[in-house]
Structures are given as C-alpha cells and as structure tokens.
Amino acid sequence: MKGIKKLLGLGLALTLSLGMAACSSSGKDNEEVGDKLQQIKDSGKLVLATSADYSPYEFHAMVDGKDTIVGFDVSIANAIADEIGVELEVMDMDFDGLLGALNADKADIVLACMTPDEERVKNADFSELYYEDKNVVIVRKGEEDKIKSDEDLKNINVGVQRGSTQEGFVVDTLGSTNYKSLTKIPDLMLELQNGNIDAIVTGKNVAAINVQNYDNVAIGNSNVGENCEESGAVALKKSDSNDSLVELINKVIKKLQDEGKVDEYMQEAIKLADEQ
C-alpha cells in the first residue's frame, strides 16, 4: 500500500509539474505575442513602410531644404501616430517588398495606396478603406483614342507597377502576356516616353500628376481599367495582437473622413507634388 501511495504521489507531482510548465509556456507565448498597440507606445515610434514613387500618395520633396517623404498616405500615417502619441518613422522601399517588411517586423504599418485584394488579405490584416480611386491609362500624346476597351490592352505592350492591383488586373483579369512590370512609376514613364511600352495602367490621381511632370504623354480618352478600382487601406502584419491597433486606426480614418480631412490631405499632396 505504501508503494502504491508513493507512486500516486509521484504521479500527482508530475501532473502538477507538467501543468505548471504548460501554463508557463502559454504565458510566455502570450507575452511574446503581446498587444501591438502597446508595443508601439512603448517604443515611442510608429514605423511606416511605403514606396515613395507614387505621387501624390507618397513621394520625395524638399521640405525646409531637406529631402523628405511626404504625400497623402504620409498625412494619414501622421494622424495615426498623433492619435497613438508617438513619432512617425518612414521607410522607403520597392512596392513589392512592403508586405515582406511587415512580416519581417521591420515596419508596423504599410500605407502605399494598397488595395486589400483577395490575395493580400491572406497575408496581411487591413483597416477599413480610407480612399478610393479609378484607374486610367497613360499614353503618348496623339494616341489618346488608341485604346478604347480593356480588350485593346491585350494587344499592346502595357506597363504596370510590380505587385500592384493594376498588375493583377492586366495579368489575371485580362490574361495579358504582353506587359512590362517595373517597381517604380517614374521608370514606367520613361519606358513610355522612349517607346518601349504603349500605355501605363495606374490610378487617376497618380496619372494626373505624372502627365504634368513628363513630356509627350497624356491620359487616354477611355474607361479602360475602370473595373479595377484602386483603393487605400492600412496594412498590418497578420496577427492576433492587432485588434486594438486596427480599432484605433479605423477610428482615426472615420474621424478624418467625417471632418473632411481626407479630401484636404489629398489636395495638399497634389499641390505639393505640383510644386516639385
């Protein structure tokens, strides 16, 4: 009997020990996951990743004699940082590397006029939309009526930004194989000027700025690409720790929309882009 009692005692001790270890491990996991909003507050900064070649959303400008990343998306990000009570730090990189930066914990959020399409929502969390825009085509002057339908895009060499919604539209929706995908809009504009591509599919606001900055180009007279809307939402690393941060971001977005600040930020960005 004493032997049985001893074995039972050892079994109970082992069970308690394993239970405590499991609780300890679970607590550690929860601590590692933590709350993203609190982590940002503790760090004192909100790190934004963007691709600053997409004026008026994000671009380089001389501000007080210093090269600075500015634009519509940056204004939205600043409003979010202000609400949290931290400084905004901006990282500039290629558009197709933005979600990778989130997953590698190099950035807290991405604002880059990024549409939360079906593929992206598998790999990132998103806020509510803060802006929506139509797509247009940029062509060489004198060719404004050359492209009349989406089908016409399949018969020409089209330029799109790599990793963009427009690339998905051209490749997946139209099934086009005759296209050029580059990481930066200015590079696409030069390709168009030099005759290496026939058109660029991009957002209406981006097109309006770029046709002013480059010679011999214009916006096409058609509704090509209008079924592929461009919209902006804040992207975050896919995680269970984002709930409070997403809630705060959505609160900021609604407040900016209700107060007319979203349109104000866009007009300010367009004006600043025109001055560069």
Labelled PLM ranges:
Residues L18-A22:
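C-terminal motif of bacterial Sec signal peptides marking the signal peptidase cleavage site
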Residues S24, V74-E83, S164, S231-A273:
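Extended ligand-binding regions for polar small-molecule ligands
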Residues D29-C113:
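Extracytoplasmic small-molecule ligand-binding "clamshell" domains
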Residues Q39, R140-N157:
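Flexible hinge/capping segments at coil-to-helix
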Residues G44-T50, D150-G163:
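Short loop->beta-strand "edge-of-pocket" segments that line small-molecule binding or catalytic clefts
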Residues A79-E83, M91-D92, D96-I109, N123-D125, ...:
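Short helices/loops that flank or line small-molecule/ion binding pockets
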Residues G97, M114-K122, F169-D172, Q193-N194, ...:
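A ligand-binding cleft/hinge motif common to bilobed small-molecule-binding domains
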Residues E132-V139, A208, Q212-K251, I270-Q276:
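Periplasmic-binding protein-like
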